[in-house]
A protein has these predicted regions:
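Select transmembrane alpha-helical segments in multipass membrane proteins
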Residues: 7-18, 43-46, 83-96, 137-141, ...
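Inter-helical loop and helix-membrane interface segments of multi-pass membrane transporters/permeases
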Residues: 2-6, 33-38, 68-90, 103-156, ...
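C-terminal membrane-solvent junction of multi-pass transporters and transport-like membrane proteins
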Residues: 84-90, 330-341, 380-441, 452-456, ...
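Transmembrane helix-boundary motif of multi-pass solute transporters/channels
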Residues: 10-48, 225-228, 239-242, 246-249
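Membrane-embedded translocation segments of transport machinery
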Residues: 2-8, 158, 162-311, 315, ...
Length: 494
């Protein structure tokens, strides 16, 4: 059977797809709240610095690794050294876990969008306790994502991203403009969100900014390696990486402009509780209900936007695992995608059930080592594994490939880097960025230990050990890692 190599048809398609992966639910509820609680505009400045110091360097390196290998993350590492393939296997396991709980949240956003359309946004009291509905809408959300995945890279992911990302941005800007013209309470909302407070900046605030920059950009989970494998040498990696980082940061900033003035105008008493998942699924529906007739329109537009952010993120997560199954087991794309989504859906069922009654406001019934399933999976992946995986990328590019060779290959497509940027990149990728990522990892471990969640740490590193064993047992000697099958970054005909 003849195989065909496919990828993104254009640079803008790649940028929008990667931005779609980076722009997720964390941008819309995590960044605004963290900004409001950690020094406002002062925190934003620190966050932007972290995007440059951690985000840009790591993302560029991961995209480069993918384009260099034209293959899945495991093969990308294996082509550098046969004993490094397990690092890529860890990068494939991470999104597999994230899909399982992210799809539950995606099901919520889908349900909220539909209920907003019918004028019933405040559904948390009934929806969260209806296990059947939770499972149903998780399935619907995964099906919506699968439709895009099954279309392939060019006709599925790229085409969808070219439509969905501009729509998401336009809706967000429209809601922000509306929020800023509400009148009373707007100034208070903006002050709550962005009032500079340098006295409130502590080392912990810096850690929060570093962590947010890291997680917001989809680093350390194989996505940028996978999407990078679908690009050619004609794509300017430096410019593309910069545009992805800028788009992601803009969305996060504008989200706060849309949310806090609205909350302050319609119910300022809710400002103090405007955080996390509760902000998205409890506070904002209450605000929309208080808007009267226009609230239905704003609510529908908002949750459609949130659903788009969730879908584009999950699509990228599924694609990482799907690409691996296609290339390593020679599966058809549709079959591989169905297997990945099916397994993740089965695992998502206990996650949805474990959340219990109004679990996004109250502590859910413990299911795994004293934590609900969603929190446990989130802590394992975001707090422990993602920094480890990103650290692998920096070490491999900085010390195995070397910055000089990496820069030469990045420039191979006629996209030269300025001399000063080459020098800065060499220092950053070898020393500064790995050190900062290590600080993020240590800070995360300390927070888990302080919270009594040592089981999270043990489970996460046990997964890494399992990936090492699995790689050396099943994949290391299977092939050289450089044959045509491994380097095929595309689909098998269906």
């Amino acid at each position: 059977m003849e195989k065909k190599k496919v990828g993104f048809a254009s640079g803008i398609g790649f940028i929008l797809a990667a931005a779609g992966s980076a722009v997720g639910l964390g941008n819309l509820w995590g960044f605004p709240y963290k900004t409001s609680q950690n020094g406002g505009a002062a925190f934003v400045l620190i966050y932007v610095a972290c995007v440059l110091l951690i985000g840009f360097v790591t993302m560029l390196s991961e995209i480069y690794l993918g384009r260099r290998a034209q293959a899945n993350p495991m093969t990308a590492y294996k082509m550098i050294h046969k004993n490094l393939g397990w690092c890529g296997l860890v990068a494939i396991v991470i999104p597999a876990f994230i899909i399982c709980y992210y799809s539950v949240l995606g099901g919520w956003t889908t349900k909220y969008a539909l209920n907003s359309f019918s004028g019933n946004a405040g559904i948390v009291g009934t929806f969260s306790v209806n296990t059947g509905e939770v499972i149903l809408y998780t399935a619907i959300f995964l099906v919506l994502s699968m439709v895009i995945i099954m279309g392939g890279v060019k006709d599925g992911i790229e085409k969808a991203s070219k439509v969905l990302m501009p729509v998401l941005f336009l809706i967000l800007v429209a809601i922000a403009v509306y929020a800023l013209t509400l009148g009373s309470g707007v100034r208070e909302g903006l002050s709550f969100y962005l009032k500079p407070d340098f006295s409130g900046i502590t080392f912990k605030s810096v850690l929060v900014a570093m962590g947010q920059a890291f997680y917001s950009l989809s680093l350390g989970m194989g996505i940028m390696i996978t999407y990078g494998s679908y690009t050619g040498k004609e794509v300017n990696l430096v410019r593309s990486t910069a545009m992805i980082c800028i788009f992601d940061t803009l969305v996060a900033l504008i989200a706060g402009l849309a949310i806090f003035p609205s909350v302050a105008h319609f119910d300022p008493a809710l400002l103090g509780s405007s955080k996390g998942v509760a902000l998205m699924f409890i506070i904002l529906p209450q605000v929309f209900e208080s808007m009267g007739g226009v609230g239905q329109v704003v609510s529908f537009a908002f949750f459609v936007m949130v659903d788009i952010a969730a879908i584009t993120s999950v699509v990228s997560l599924i694609e990482v695992v799907t690409q691996f199954v296609i290339q390593k087991f020679h599966a058809h794309r549709k079959r591989a995608a169905l297997i990945v989504a099916g397994v993740c859906f089965v695992v998502s069922i206990p996650i949805g059930i474990s959340l219990g009654h109004v679990a996004i406001l109250e502590e859910a019934s413990p299911a795994l080592f004293g934590l609900d399933w969603l929190t446990f999976f989130d802590e394992v992946t975001n707090t422990v594994l993602m920094p480890v995986c990103a650290l692998f990328s920096c070490i491999v590019v900085g010390w195995f490939i070397t910055p000089r060779r990496a820069v030469a290959e990045i420039e191979a497509g006629g996209t030269p880097m300025a001399g000063w940027l080459k020098k800065v990149y060499a220092v950053m990728i070898r020393f500064v960025t790995p050190a900062l990522i290590l600080i993020v990892e240590i800070g995360g471990l300390q927070s888990e230990i302080a919270a009594g969640n040592t089981a999270v740490i043990v489970f996460a590193y046990a997964l890494v050990a399992l990936c090492v064993v699995a790689y050396f047992a099943f994949f290391r000697n299977r092939d050289t890692g450089t044959n045509a099958d491994e380097k095929l970054s595309g689909d098998y005909p269906v």
